[in-house]
Amino acid sequence: MTKKELKKMAKELARLEHILKTTDDSDMRYRTEQEIMTLTNKVEDLEDMVMLDEMVMTLLEQES
């Protein structure tokens, strides 16, 4: 995946992670978890996974 694609995915994953942390709605949690799984299944390369994880963590830290 290109770095641009990874950045876009990281932003979306950070948004979804924020929803998971803040919602009490079990249906919303389930749909959000499914969307996260769908997105992360698109990444096959280990280096891309690590880079994506670091990007998401950075974005989540900036939110705090």
Residue ranges and their predicted role:
Residues M1-A14:
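Short, charge/polar-rich alpha-helical segments
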Residues H18-I19, S26-S64:
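Short, charge-rich amphipathic interface segments used for partner binding and complex assembly
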